[in-house]
């Protein structure tokens, strides 16, 4: 039963069917299923298939966008419930301000990462896309963040990750936050070059990295 729901959810993401995704996500909540697994084995597995198909030219952008929107619908239902359960089980592991850098409106990877952080017990403040360095820092100061996570999906916007770190230095705040970077064109070499505290290739890597950095 559980596997079939997860398989159906994965397929609904691939099909970009928002209604079915909403229905199945709500069903997972109502039936008290493992919601972290629902995100990982349903939503994330589906979007991974879509990502691979897109890279190999088997899916076109409009279909990819439909799948991305369907995933947002699922996350909107599941994330608050995961966060609620996390809160009832005790304090959060830390606060993470997350966003896609200025000039970049890609958010699939960021959304998956945010969901995984929430599932792992972190309080996530997702700023969305096209966020300036000042925006990241202002929110981090406001909420008392431990980590700033900056995603860039374009080679032309990667530089904004560097600018974020430079802005923190400029404001004498560099030691106040750990900065994690990620996104398609980024790498460990890039993270080292710009002085980031870490780089994550996948959402799971990001959680592992945050745990390591904060000693959780």
From Swiss-Prot:
It holds the Pfam family B12-binding. One of its GO terms (cellular component) is cytosol. NCBIfam families: pyl_corrinoid (TIGR02370). InterPro entries: Cbl-bd_cap, Cobalamin-bd, Cobalamin-bd_sf, Corrinoid_p, Met_Synthase/Corrinoid, Meth_synthase_dom. Gene3D superfamilies: Cobalamin-binding domain (3.40.50.280), Methionine synthase domain (1.10.1240.10). Keywords: Cobalt, Metal-binding, One-carbon metabolism. One of its GO terms (molecular function) is cobalamin binding. Residues 1-90 form the B12-binding N-terminal domain. This is Corrinoid protein DSY3155. Belongs to the methylamine corrinoid protein family. One of its GO terms (biological process) is one-carbon metabolic process. Residues 93-216 form the B12-binding domain. Probably harbors a corrinoid prosthetic group and acts as a methyl group carrier between MtgB and MtgA. A methyl group from glycine betaine is likely first transferred to the corrinoid prosthetic group of the enzyme by MtgB, and then transferred to tetrahydrofolate (THF) by MtgA. The methyl group may then be ultimately converted to carbon dioxide, and its oxidation would also provide reducing equivalents for anaerobic respiration. Thus, may function in the pathway that allows anaerobic methylotrophic growth of D.hafniense using glycine betaine. Methylcob(III)alamin binds at residue 106.
């Amino acid at each position: 039963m559980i596997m079939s729901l997860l398989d159906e959810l994965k397929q609904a993401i691939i099909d970009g069917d928002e209604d079915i995704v909403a229905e199945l996500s709500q069903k997972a909540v109502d039936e008290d299923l493992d919601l972290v697994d629902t995100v990982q084995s349903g939503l994330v597995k589906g979007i991974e298939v879509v990502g691979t198909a897109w890279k190999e030219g088997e899916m076109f952008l409009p279909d990819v966008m439909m799948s991305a929107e369907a995933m947002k619908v699922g996350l909107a239902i599941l994330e608050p419930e995961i966060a609620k359960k996390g809160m009832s089980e005790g304090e959060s592991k830390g606060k993470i301000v997350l966003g896609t850098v200025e000039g970049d409106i890609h958010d699939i990877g960021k959304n998956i990462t945010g969901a995984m952080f929430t599932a792992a017990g972190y309080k996530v403040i997702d700023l969305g896309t096209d966020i300036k360095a000042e925006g990241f820092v202002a929110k981090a100061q406001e909420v008392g963040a431990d980590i700033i996570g900056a995603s860039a999906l374009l080679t032309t916007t990667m530089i904004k990750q560097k600018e974020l770190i430079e802005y923190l230095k400029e404001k004498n705040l560099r030691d106040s936050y750990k900065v994690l970077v990620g996104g398609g064109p980024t790498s460990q070499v890039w993270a080292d070059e710009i002085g980031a505290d870490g780089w994550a290739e996948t959402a799971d890597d990001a959680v592992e990295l945050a745990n390591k950095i904060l000693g959780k």
